[in-house]
Design a protein with these regions (language model features):
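Short coil/turn segments within WD40 beta-propeller repeats
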Residues: 26-29, 49-54, 86-89, 105-109, ...
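WD40/WD-repeat beta-propeller blade-loop signature
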Residues: 27, 40, 84-88, 98, ...
């Protein structure tokens, strides 16, 4: 059976695409935008396998009224690049001027966008794969191939107190995690939002800060970060904390049969979506009520059906192997998913 080999080239840039000055020279692992973009600039960070986090500044005042005569240099400028000792697998914003990075060299770094300085917060025992910042609890969370989940004190007021708060053992490697809700609400903002749990019916967001952790072996843990943060505070104060206080609120098995590639929480705060290497996405909800759980679903995506005489993906057949019987599906891994804030 021959294995299809893609002969496609990347699509050409359109008139509305922006070409980044001095782009990353390796595979881009993550792209994030400043949490509270303020005119006239928006900060963007791109982590890469070229051992760097690249910092770009987007001129939003120009891009809003951009014309064909506006050059990319007027829209995007490269501010700096933060060098690491190994490929960088993830990056997240903490404030508009402070970010954190996850690297194969096992270290958790803080990146000061104003001064260009880097601070090593701590390290794991194996490659650091994912990290997220929870603004409600002021916790930085990191997940690693060492099967550990770590919570860090960034200490924005006193950098000398920054360091490790707590490390929890996981049953498998942490390959995905996210904070719910992913877009913090502004003070007093009660604008309804649409959710997959109630199609076509806007309802208030669930503001409960949760951490969703996806692992190899299809494990999914869900933590309520408010009681977890309280347990961390009690332990830091010298109090004894029961083992049950460190346990997740929910232990689940992924609806997807194959390993996850990404996990993102819904803006509504009531669920999350996961993607897999087998071209599928699953949508799940936190509420354990059977009626709510009955609404979870999964769907296929990023697939192409190849029929007889229409096989644009196969370049050639390896000698000695049989041709694949048509029709068949070419399945692509879903490496990344994202929700629009609204």
């Amino acid at each position: 059976m021959s294995r299809p080999t893609s002969s496609r080239s990347s699509p050409a840039a359109t008139a509305v695409d922006l070409l980044l000055p001095d782009p990353p020279r390796g595979t881009v692992s993550a792209v994030v935008f400043s949490p509270t973009p303020a005119a006239p600039h928006i900060n963007a960070l791109a982590s890469s396998w070229d051992h760097r986090v690249h910092h770009y500044r987007i001129n939003s005042s120009v891009s809003d009224s951009a014309s064909t005569s506006t050059s990319d240099q007027d829209l995007v400028t490269k501010v700096q690049a933060f060098a690491h000792e190994a490929p960088v697998l993830d990056v997240c914003f903490i404030t508009d001027t402070l970010a954190a990075s996850a690297s194969v060299d096992r270290r958790v770094r803080l990146l000061d966008l104003q001064t260009g300085k880097t601070l090593i917060l701590g390290k794991h025992e194996d490659s650091l794969l994912k990290l997220r910042w929870c603004p409600q609890t002021q916790l930085l969370v990191s997940g690693s191939a060492d099967r550990k989940l770590s919570f860090w004190n960034v200490s924005l007021e006193d950098p000398t107190k920054a360091g490790l708060f707590k490390t929890l053992d996981m049953p498998d490697k942490v390959i995905a995690l996210d904070i719910s809700p992913p877009f913090p609400l502004a003070n007093g903002d009660s604008t309804p939002i649409y959710s997959a749990s109630a199609p076509g019916k806007p309802h208030p967001r669930d503001p409960t800060p949760r951490l969703v952790v996806g692992m190899t072996g299809r494990h999914v843990f869900v933590y309520d970060l408010l009681p977890l943060h309280s347990a961390i505070d009690r332990e830091q104060a010298g109090e004894r904390v029961a083992e049950r206080d460190w346990q997740p609120d929910q232990k689940r098995e992924s609806s997807l049969k194959f390993m996850a590639r990404d996990l993102r929480c819904m803006p509504s705060g009531d669920g999350y979506a996961t993607s897999s290497i087998e071209g599928r996405i699953a949508v799940e909800f936190f509420d354990p009520n059977p009626k709510v759980q009955a609404m979870k679903y999964a769907f296929k995506c990023h697939r192409e059906t190849v029929s007889e005489g229409a096989d644009p993906l196969v370049v050639g057949v390896v000698e000695g192997e049989e041709e694949m019987e048509t029709p068949y599906d070419v399945v692509y891994p879903v490496h990344g998913i994202a929700f629009h804030p609204k």
